């Protein structure tokens, strides 16, 4: 069985990685699909996010990383799967994700969404929280893979570096 795990992953967190690892243990193949959303202004380019996820999942032989734009169900169809994997941290996530799952089923009734709850020690994590902590110089190495922590340090150091003379 093959599943699709879509998201913007800006940036990838250890919570995302935990879901990828756990999801990969449940299916024959897991496709991590990185959304290119023109309505958002990500901290990291699509290429950077693809590189971060690929580097962070290289130990998983059944995980591939792709990019997509448009509808998740269209991407899943292109990948030859009807199974979409999503993570839940709290009830507020469930309400949002349930709405998206119902929308996906209205577009393609053959699709199923499987929800995995996050591991308790990652339940506080979100990409937004990570960026906020990094923006103010806080340590994020316990929140993100090493490659992401390094990229965040470069991003925020360059964003706040004084102009050269």
UniProtKB/Swiss-Prot annotation:
GO biological process: coenzyme A biosynthetic process
Subcellular location: Cytoplasm
Positions contributing to ATP binding: 8-9, 16, 87-89, 97, 122-128
Chief place of localization: cytoplasm
Gene Ontology CC annotations of this record: cytoplasm
Pathway: Cofactor biosynthesis; coenzyme A biosynthesis; CoA from (R)-pantothenate: step 4/5
UniProt site (Transition state stabilizer): 16
Top EC class, one word: transferase
Known EC number: 2.7.7.3
InterPro entries: Cyt_trans-like, PPAT, Rossmann-like_a/b/a_fold
HAMAP family assigned to the protein according to its UniProt record, in alphabetical order: PPAT_bact
Similarity comment text for this entry: Belongs to the bacterial CoaD family.
Its job: Reversibly transfers an adenylyl group from ATP to 4'-phosphopantetheine, yielding dephospho-CoA (dPCoA) and pyrophosphate.
Protein name as it appears in the record: Phosphopantetheine adenylyltransferase
Lineage: Bacteria, Bacillati, Cyanobacteriota, Cyanophyceae, Synechococcales
Gene behind the chain: coaD
């Amino acid at each position: 069985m093959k599943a699709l795990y879509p998201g913007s992953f800006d940036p990838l967190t250890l919570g995302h990685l935990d879901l990828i690892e756990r999801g990969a243990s449940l299916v024959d193949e897991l496709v991590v699909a990185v959304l290119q959303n023109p309505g958002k202004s990500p901290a990291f380019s699509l290429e950077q996010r693809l590189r971060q996820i690929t580097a962070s999942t290289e130990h998983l032989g059944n995980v591939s990383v792709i990019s997509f734009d448009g509808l998740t169900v269209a991407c899943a169809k292109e990948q030859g799967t009807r199974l979409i994997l999503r993570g839940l941290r709290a009830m507020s996530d469930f309400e949002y994700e349930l709405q998206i799952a119902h929308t996906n089923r209205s577009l393609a009734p053959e699709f199923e969404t499987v929800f995995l709850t996050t591991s308790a020690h990652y339940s506080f994590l979100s990409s937004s929280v990570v960026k906020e902590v990094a923006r103010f110089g806080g340590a994020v190495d316990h929140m993100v893979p090493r490659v992401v922590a390094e990229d965040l340090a470069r991003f925020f150091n360059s964003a706040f570096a004084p102009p050269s003379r």
